[in-house]
Amino acid sequence: PDVHMELDEEYDILYSSGTTGIPKGIIHSHLARNLLISGTQSMAFDEAVVLTSTPLYSNTTITTWWPSVWMGATQVIMRKFNAEGANALIAEYGVTHAMLVPVQYQRMWAAGNHRPENWRSVQWLLSTSAPLSTEMKKKILRDTQAQLLEFYGLTEGGVATTLVARKAAELGKLASVGQVQAGGELRILGEGGELLGPNEAGEIVGRTGIMSDGYLNREEATKAMHWFDEDGRLFYRSGDVGYLDEDGWLFLSDRIKDMILSGGQNIYATDLEHALNALSDVIESAVVAKPSEQWGETPWAFVVRRAGCDKIEDEIRLEANETLSPIQAIAGVTFMDELPRSDIGKILKRQLRDNFTVTA
């Protein structure tokens, strides 16, 4: 049929992960998807064997799914992810490309059948949806010869950075989420909306060539995401706190909604999580604000212990607090078998907050 589509016409509607509230339908144009495909030309998808293990409806998956379909790559699709199965498929099919979220990398490296030699075929590894820890990046670079790319951004577009891990490691920037993608711009805003300078933390806003058309039937939510510079150009608000260093590398601090206001002081939950995750008996953790009549909010940690650990909650809490300032001190710990996650692997902190009853 004779069908003509304009580049600015709607192409798809993807839903946000809903980690902080009700998922929102995000509208993307044909131009946005064309730019996604053209931006991966250097990754040789025409000869690729691509492992697909995340939900097909997510923007995370589309990053490798669409280029591989467009260029005729081989797809190795998992109906449901499990770490040992993914490791086995990489070895069996000689996987060359994979988009994995941080928790998948963690579980695959911890699995009993993880062997670095089985990853020799892998040329490109990608990560997004949540920050990939510096320690995990180091393990990937040590155990594979692959190019590791970490993407930070929004399904909505606007804010987008890329970390080329081997280059970042050489420059001592591995803890960052990279530099702004070609054609993009980033700004850091203070609490009053003022522009901040290098190494000053504030809300990250950005603009790119790939920007959604807003939220489906959510006009107010769309407007709330907008920020305009002095020239009237549209930027998107990320809802994340971070800073740009003097070389333009972006470092994340926390989600604005995840910051804890205790006794008038802002506490970054990620700082506390890093302290907990560095403990030998902790697999992973999530820290949220617990209501407190005395302080307003206090930090409370949900922790997954390593097998065989017999320490009680207070021992873990005190051990972590030894590395934190008194202002950051964790008030309590709850052990869990696993943390609640979305289908794409993001920790659902709103579910953790639902555990609380207001106490002094």
Regions found by a protein language model. Name each.
Residues 34-49, 57-97, 111:
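Conserved AMP-binding/adenylation subdomain of ANL enzymes
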Residues 70, 95-100, 109-172, 185, ...:
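Gly/Ser/Thr-rich phosphate-binding loop
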Residues 90, 98-101, 208, 213-214, ...:
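AMP-binding/adenylate-forming catalytic core of the ANL superfamily
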